[in-house]
């Protein structure tokens, strides 16, 4: 009985492995970058940033493999997340991870930084096009669904120029930065309207 219950519990856990878990990886990537920059002032942090980078890469691989397993075994849950008015905004986290890692590797390996940046830019562009199209075309989105999480797809566009300029892609960097700023202003206006004239945002959805 215990064995059978365990086998039934494992698929349930996999179904509940949401796209939001990539936020942990993004947080670690950002923390690694902060420690790496701190190493310029405090050399003792240089070794710490190396270990943090290895840990972040391992965590990224682990989360990606688990989520890929979920996509293969439970594709219906992926579709539900994509159609969810809040969770859909967390898919660009993957692009942001690549973009932040491209900044981390600027001082370590320019070639790895370049490939990470290109991957992040492609994923960011695809995510932005599909998600913004979803915002415009979906009829089930309501003002109550507007949360700070809606900024996630846009913030990625603003990150692009950090490594993009170093790699010589000035025009592409300006394009993403301009798109990010324009949509950030639009979303900020909508969020302020939602906070003033509608019910307050739940605490669990606040940054």
Task: Show which residues each predicted segment covers.
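Hydrophobic, membrane-facing alpha-helical anchors
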Residues: 1-14, 62-78, 121-138, 183-195
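Juxtamembrane helix-loop boundaries in multi-pass membrane proteins
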Residues: 5-33, 49, 53, 75-100, ...
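Generic alpha-helical scaffold signal
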Residues: 25, 42, 55, 59-62, ...
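Alpha-helical transmembrane segments of multi-pass membrane proteins
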Residues: 28-37, 63-67
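Helix-coil boundary and interhelical linker segments in multi-pass alpha-helical membrane proteins
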Residues: 35-49, 103-115, 162-174
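Structural signature of hydrophobic alpha-helical transmembrane segments
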Residues: 50-65, 111-125, 171-186
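Internal transmembrane alpha-helix with an interfacial aromatic "cap," most often the third helix
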Residues: 100, 104-107, 127-141, 159-172, ...
